[in-house]
Design a protein with these regions (language model features):
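Long, compositionally biased stretches
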Residues: 1-116, 129, 133-135
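Short alpha-helix capping/helix-loop boundary micro-motifs
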Residues: 117-123
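A short glycine-leucine-enriched loop at secondary-structure breakpoints
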Residues: 124-128
Length: 138
């Protein structure tokens, strides 16, 4: 995992998004994302999710259900849409925390999964930059 740009909270705190995250997580989301750098098969699997989200061309072996997060406009500023996939996250595989992989329609993170949860994942897992994290789709 790695630190992001520190800007996710601006988007995550928006009430329009938070209301939609309740449908994904069962509750509102922590106002931030956990960034997971992806390599090898994990990157291929993530690209499959991007295909399911309609962001890349190709075929996907993934069977996860995409959940659409609608964008909106507020005070002349556009907030883009995203696609979420329900998942669980763990640091060692013993304890799992409900989460979702969030793939914004517009992102620079094409090799990094952005994970949302009702928990502050850095403390709940706990984890820090460089730690290996396990995510499984549900």
């Amino acid at each position: 995992m790695s630190s992001g740009l520190g800007r996710a909270h601006v988007f995550m705190a928006q009430p329009h998004y938070q209301n939609q995250f309740k449908g994904v997580l069962g509750t509102g989301a922590w106002p931030g994302t956990l960034n997971i750098d992806l390599y090898g098969d994990n990157l291929s699997n993530y690209k499959g999710l991007r295909v399911l989200a309609g962001l890349e061309k190709g075929e996907s072996a993934e069977s996860a259900e995409p959940i659409r997060i609608q964008g909106f406009e507020r005070s002349g500023r556009s907030f883009g849409g995203a696609t979420a996939f329900k998942a669980e996250i763990s640091r060692g595989g013993d304890e799992w925390i409900s989460c979702a992989i969030l793939i914004p329609d517009l992102t620079r993170h094409t090799q990094t999964a952005e994970v949302i949860s009702s928990s502050f994942l850095r403390e709940a897992l706990p984890c820090e930059d460089g730690d290996e994290i396990i995510i499984r789709l549900i």
